[in-house]
Amino acid sequence: MIIPVLDIMNGMAVSGKSGKRETYIPLKTIFHPSSNPYKIANALKDASAKRIYIADLDAIENRKPNYDIIKKINQELPVMLDSGVNTVNKAEEALEIAEKVIIATETLQSIDDLIDILDSNNKDRFIISIDIKDNEIFSKHLDMDIEDIVKKMGEINPPEIILLDISRVGTEKGVDHAIIKKFLKLDSSLIIGGGITSKDIEELEKLGLNKFLVGTALHANKLSI
């Protein structure tokens, strides 16, 4: 399953590379002539998308979130939302507007906070995103390496885990299969993102993986839903 990716900033769908948000520009996509996220999401639904990954870049950077737009999209297409959730209160707000809420290592302050959030609601409504940059765990607060994270995820056993290589986002360079293989021992369902190519999908499906986050290649018509 290809899960379309939509980054939203200042009310618009935007695109960029390698997580350098200050350089992001309005998204150009084959699905709609505008950068209106609601219209793009509806076009993705018409193209047979079953769910959509949305990163609210304003919320992640502690600016005014785009929750009205996201709530509207969620009424048309189930949203997996990354809005920088790192507290129970933020999780509750996000759960009101999205089908599932992402807790990402980028903004998570501690593993204790993660456990508190997971215990606060139905565990199935949360997805943990393991953010990776330059082959290391990307986090503003956590001091953990990949082996530490794999061990901790085995203990927590979340239903779904995203492995997102931020350094490869928007590059279409493919993903690091060696890192992915370290997580295959977990019982959690894995969703792979960051520079995904058709070759990646073909090879990763052989490992039993079947959920992929795709943005740039999808919007440029290099991959289809």
Tell where the protein language model's regions lie, with residue ranges.
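N-terminal beta-alpha supersecondary unit
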Residues: 18-62
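Conserved anion-binding
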Residues: 8-30, 98-169
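Glycine-enriched alpha-helix->loop->beta-strand junction motifs that scaffold or abut catalytic
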Residues: 48, 76-77, 93-102, 120-126, ...
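N-terminal active-site wall of soluble small-molecule enzyme domains
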Residues: 43-94, 177-179
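Hydrophobic faces of well-ordered beta-strands that scaffold small-molecule active sites
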Residues: 2-8, 52-54, 79-83, 101-103, ...
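Glycine-rich phosphate-binding active-site loops on the catalytic face of alpha/beta enzymes
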Residues: 97-113, 162-168, 193-225
